[in-house]
């Protein structure tokens, strides 16, 4: 039977519990990528891969609206502002944009805008179309025409104060020109580097022996976020203005007018911004910009469309993290051909064996690429989660033609020595997309994925997925905290901000203490003493000094460290104090810090609600392990068209003594399509009966279902918990940690939204807003909008022509208000 991983399962086939699991996992993954991209300027996936994650999350939220806004990624825009800079709270949030890739999506976007506004196709509707600059978002605040503050996007609400650095950028005026400059004028735009300036900066970096920047975006971000403005001044950063934040008055009523006003004020604006009045015109401009892309001299990754009229923008408003009135139309990924020189395996924090292709360096989209992700074992073999071929080798690519004697069936895998097509979508980690079979060496052999961890020699296994009845795509090391690669990564995760948040323990200290043998598991952090800690740090410093001397061709001198005892001792005391400050920790943070596969922040909070403390959680998992389901029970629900509900009906019928489960009426609501699927899987009626009886004997017990049936936890997470706590060394590590720290249950935060937790129903004709606007406003203020009235309804907003819902409200004693009263409440909120 085909496997269905949570990532592969079509959204339309998901149950509510499966959707919640997938939503939680995706949200946590996206939030981590946001942190790396916006907070560290160090992304690890391509823009296209990130966009795919976002689109799947949005698809889940569209089908399951109750999940919208429940995860960090649903509402987050960037990443928290760095502690290196002063914080600036944006008067108007700096939001992100939704993405589109196909031309039909642009048509759908325009139609969606018209539906929301109630505009017929005959009524004019204008948009602006402008290049999407691949740089760093910036907000400039002018007061009285003078630049007073410049801030990065940060997380959209709070950014970093980079005013001193921005004052060194020649293209950004310190004073705005003109008589119509608003008293308060917040300008939003993008800082970027031209291709020529980027090449010059990297040439200077190479000459000075410093690391090269991967691409202009990273170079621009790194240059702007310098603590020393002198470094920023030495880098020729540029700027395009394209939007407004807080304005005391508006110099224009349209986006196109605003761009004209910015130009009058002396701000640089993109000359390729155009006002369009039809989808055809928008797409024509997109194609024109794509054609000109290579000649622009700076990086762009698409075109941004915005509703031109500000009054309409205000009516359209926002949804989660993006405006309804704007959309980014992304360009396809860029590509090139090169050769795989080696395949290496990196071990991740949770023990995942991650294959990486070492490539003969090649320029892709202006960036020199020497590495590419190979994702997992199946991807190297050229198959998907269902065992279907994902590559077949290509017969034509940039002049390469397939010879007649090359067998396409042998072209699905990736081998060392292969000539491959590499795709890159505006980021640093590209991927191997296909193989040019004509250039495959005669001695190239299929890659043998290791079954032992390259870091510690422990077994590496592909875990059994209880939801699909299949093996996971990722092979993992079972060494846990005894694995050097995994151990350090787990410790880094343990001290990270959203886990134990131990200040000062960065990667360097973790590596130093791990290599010195002082810290091999989390509990060791709480056993550190001053003298051994100091000795390890001093030894590490001396070793690095000796390495630098040897690299410079000098003989290392055996000399004592310079006497900076007071500073050094103070720093070490600060580290120890930071550890001591974490001897009491909320239970959810403790759980998250353990780095258990599938247990992100949201799941950790759910587990902390289920169990009062760690011993109770561990006992609950042990009990779940003792009564977990067998493979026949799992397999029955993983068949095509047969889910958990049908499985329960089949089991109930078998338990009731039904001998022919496919007879009419034997199983409630069993469709003909489901009967066909069952017969295809089990051969005949007797085979089905035997399989269901086996599944009946393998039903999970209550302890397992207590976790697996909970929509916030689910079967996959339950399996991960069982796997983690089944390893004796993991249990020992947790128990050792519990001897050092105390957990406490976190309180429930107060709701911030005005109508938080309330259910609102709209009925009748609404005269001053469309139904979509009303729903969006209610949800923005924290309410849940329902289509029917019940005793659980808190408020009914009734317009003219209200019918049965108004009667239901009277029946249940629900408060009823008019549209005018609702708008007054919204205005006061």
From Swiss-Prot:
NAD(+) binds at residues 47-51, 96-97, 130, 153, 190, 306, 330. Disulfide bonds: none annotated. Keywords: DNA damage, DNA repair, DNA replication, Ligase, Magnesium, Manganese, Metal-binding, NAD, Zinc. It catalyses: NAD(+) + (deoxyribonucleotide)n-3'-hydroxyl + 5'-phospho-(deoxyribonucleotide)m = (deoxyribonucleotide)n+m + AMP + beta-nicotinamide D-nucleotide. The keyword Nuclease does not apply. Residues 1-23 are annotated as: Disordered. The keyword Methyltransferase does not apply. Its cofactor is Mg(2+); Mn(2+). One of its GO terms (biological process) is DNA repair. GO terms for cellular component: cytosol. Belongs to the NAD-dependent DNA ligase family. LigA subfamily. DNA ligase that catalyzes the formation of phosphodiester linkages between 5'-phosphoryl and 3'-hydroxyl groups in double-stranded DNA using NAD as a coenzyme and as the energy source for the reaction. It is essential for DNA replication and repair of damaged DNA. This is DNA ligase. The gene is ligA.
């Amino acid at each position: 039977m085909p496997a269905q991983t949570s990532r592969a399962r079509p959204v339309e086939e998901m149950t509510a519990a499966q959707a919640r699991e997938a939503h939680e996992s995706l949200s946590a993954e996206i939030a981590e990528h946001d942190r790396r991209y916006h907070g560290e300027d160090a992304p690890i996936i391509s823009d296209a891969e990130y966009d795919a994650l976002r689109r799947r999350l949005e698809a889940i939220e569209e089908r399951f609206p109750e999940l919208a806004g429940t995860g960090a990624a649903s509402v987050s825009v960037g990443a928290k502002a760095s502690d290196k800079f002063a914080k600036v709270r944006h008067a108007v949030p700096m939001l992100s944009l939704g993405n589109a890739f196909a031309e039909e999506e642009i048509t759908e976007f325009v139609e969606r805008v018209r539906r929301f506004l109630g505009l017929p196709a005959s009524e004019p509707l204008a948009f602006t179309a402008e290049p999407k600059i691949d740089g760093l978002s910036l907000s400039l605040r002018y007061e009285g025409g003078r630049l007073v503050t410049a801030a990065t996007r940060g997380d959209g609400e709070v950014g970093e104060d980079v005013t001193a650095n921005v004052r060194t950028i020649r293209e950004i005026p310190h004073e705005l020109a003109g008589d119509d400059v608003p008293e308060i004028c917040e300008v939003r735009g993008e800082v970027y580097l031209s291709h020529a300036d980027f090449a010059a900066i990297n040439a200077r970096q190479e000459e000075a022996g410093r690391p090269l920047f991967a691409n202009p975006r990273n170079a621009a971000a790194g240059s702007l976020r310098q603590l020393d403005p002198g470094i920023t001044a030495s880098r020729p950063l540029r700027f395009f203005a394209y939007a407004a934040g807080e304005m005391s008055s508006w110099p224009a009523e349209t986006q196109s007018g605003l761009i004209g006003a910015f130009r009058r004020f002396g701000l640089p604006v993109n000359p390729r911004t155009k006002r369009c009045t039809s989808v055809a015109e928008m797409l024509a401009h997109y194609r024109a910009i794509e054609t000109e892309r290579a000649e622009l001299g700076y990086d762009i990754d698409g075109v941004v469309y915005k509703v031109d009229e500000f009054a309409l923008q205000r009516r359209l408003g926002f949804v989660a993290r993006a405006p309804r009135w704007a959309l980014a139309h992304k360009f396809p990924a860029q590509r090139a051909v090169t050769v795989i020189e080696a395949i290496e395996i990196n071990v991740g924090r949770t023990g995942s064996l991650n294959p990486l292709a070492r490539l003969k360096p090649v320029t892709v989209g202006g960036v020199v690429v020497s590495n590419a992700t190979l994702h997992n074992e199946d991807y190297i073999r050229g198959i998907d989660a269902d065992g279907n071929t994902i590559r077949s080798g290509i017969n034509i690519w940039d002049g390469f033609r397939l010879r007649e004697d090359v067998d396409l069936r042998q072209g699905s895998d990736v081998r060392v020595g292969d000539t491959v097509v590499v795709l890159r979508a505006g980021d640093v980690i590209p991927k191997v997309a296909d193989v040019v079979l004509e250039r495959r060496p005669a001695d190239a052999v299929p890659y043998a994925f290791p079954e032992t961890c390259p870091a510690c020699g422990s077994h590496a296994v592909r875990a059994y997925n209880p939801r699909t009845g299949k093996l996971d795509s990722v092979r993992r090391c079972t060494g846990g905290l005894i694995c050097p690669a995994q151990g350090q990564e787990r410790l880094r995760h343990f001290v990270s901000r959203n886990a134990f948040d131990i200040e000062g323990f960065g990667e360097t200290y973790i590596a130093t203490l791990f290599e010195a043998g002082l810290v091999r598991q989390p509990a060791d952090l709480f056993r550190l003493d001053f003298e051994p800690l100091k000795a390890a740090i001093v030894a590490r410093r001396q070793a690095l000094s000796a390495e630098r001397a040897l690299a410079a061709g000098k003989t290392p001198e055996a000399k004592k460290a310079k006497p900076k005892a007071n500073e050094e001792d103070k720093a070490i005391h600060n580290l120890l104090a930071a550890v001591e400050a974490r001897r009491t920790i909320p239970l959810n943070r403790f759980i998250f810090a353990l780095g258990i596969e599938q247990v992100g922040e949201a799941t950790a909070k759910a587990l902390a609600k289920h169990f009062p403390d760690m011993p109770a959680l561990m006992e609950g998992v042990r009990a779940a392990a003792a009564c977990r389901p067998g493979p026949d029970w799992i397999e029955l629900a993983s068949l095509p068209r047969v889910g958990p509900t049908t499985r329960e009906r089949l089991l109930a019928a078998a338990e009731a003594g039904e001998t022919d489960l496919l007879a009419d009426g034997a199983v409630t609501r069993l469709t003909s399509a489901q009967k066909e699927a069952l017969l295809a899987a089990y051969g005949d009626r007797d085979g089905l009966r035997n399989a269901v009886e086996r599944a009946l004997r393998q039903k999970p017990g209550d302890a397992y279902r207590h976790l697996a049936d909970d929509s916030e936890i689910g079967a996959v997470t339950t399996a991960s918990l069982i796997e983690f706590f089944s390893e004796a060394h993991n249990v020992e590590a947790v128990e050792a940690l519990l001897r050092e720290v105390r957990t406490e249950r976190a309180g429930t935060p107060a709701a911030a939204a005005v109508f938080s937790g309330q259910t609102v129903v709209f009925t009748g004709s609404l005269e001053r807003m469309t139904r979509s606007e009303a729903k969006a406003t209610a949800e923005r203020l924290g309410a849940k909008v329902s289509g029917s009235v019940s005793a659980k309804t808190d408020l009914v907003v009734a317009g003219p022509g209200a019918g049965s819902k108004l009667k239901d409200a009277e029946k249940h004693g629900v408060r009823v208000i008019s549209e005018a009263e609702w708008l007054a409440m919204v205005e006061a909120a």
